[in-house]
Swiss-Prot record:
One of its GO terms (biological process) is mitochondrial ribosome assembly. It comes from the Eukaryota. Residues 1-16, 68-90, 168-196 are cytoplasmic. Residues 35-50, 109-150 are lumenal. GO terms for cellular component: cytoplasm; mitochondrion; peroxisomal membrane. This is Mpv17-like protein. Keywords: Membrane, Peroxisome, Transmembrane, Transmembrane helix. It comes from Bos taurus. Pfam families: Mpv17_PMP22. The lineage of its organism: Eukaryota, Metazoa, Chordata, Craniata, Vertebrata. Belongs to the peroxisomal membrane protein PXMP2/4 family. It is found in: Peroxisome membrane. Residues 16-55 are annotated as: Targeting to peroxisomes. Participates in reactive oxygen species metabolism by up- or down-regulation of the genes of antioxidant enzymes. Protective against the mitochondrial apoptotic cascade.
Length: 196
């Protein structure tokens, strides 16, 4: 275990960008896999590949560049600086991440209107994100070293991706719809006739 951690630390020190991008994409894709397990039914590996593609091609790379730009523009860990970073991240970064997820997934799924999901779910998803991401980024900007910030965001993105992937497939972008889906799954399991 120690050698694995040492290898990861060396990789992040030598190649911080690719190491962070791969960790982010792995966590984000894992969130989609968890969402599929929670929904029940067969695994949809094509959907997970689409999520991984959006994460590697855009989200993780943008996140790495964005967090480094924020640190250059607003260096340090003073409380006012951290608050300014969180506000910038939510006001500027949040809308970009939500929009590109919905549009990117629609492109990869071959939908005719690649902006339909974004138009229908953007505001609800963005507002839901405001209940989660400011707290994540507050910890990120105050405690996490810059070289690990994208990986940390990916780790926290595991839970977010679970919600986001459900929302993209069936929900409306609200946390309430995610809880409703869980209740529907339990109800459907109760209604299924037992096989003998």
């Amino acid at each position: 275990m120690v050698s694995w951690w040492q290898a990861l630390t060396r990789a992040a020190g030598r190649y911080p960008w690719p190491a962070n991008v791969l960790l982010y994409a792995g966590f984000f894709s894992g969130g989609d896999a968890l969402q599929q397990v929670l929904r029940g039914g067969p695994a949809d590996w094509q959907h997970t590949r689409h999520v991984a593609t959006v994460a590697v091609a855009f989200h993780a790379n943008l996140n790495y560049v964005w967090l480094n730009l924020l640190e250059r523009a607003l260096p340090g860990r003073a409380p006012r600086t951290i608050l300014a970073k969180v506000l910038c991240d939510q006001a500027l970064g949040g809308p970009v991440y939500v929009s590109t997820f919905y549009a990117g997934m629609s492109i990869l799924q071959g939908k005719d209107d690649i902006f339909l999901d974004m138009r229908q779910k953007f505001w609800n998803t963005y507002k839901s994100g405001l209940m989660y991401w400011p707290f994540v980024q507050l910890i990120n900007f105050s405690l996490i070293p810059i070289r690990w910030r994208t990986a940390y965001t990916g780790l926290c993105g595991f839970l977010w991706a679970t919600f986001l992937c459900f929302s993209q497939q069936e929900g409306d972008g609200t946390f309430k719809s995610a809880f409703t889906f869980r209740r529907i799954k339990v109800t459907n399991e109760v209604e299924k006739p037992s096989e003998k």
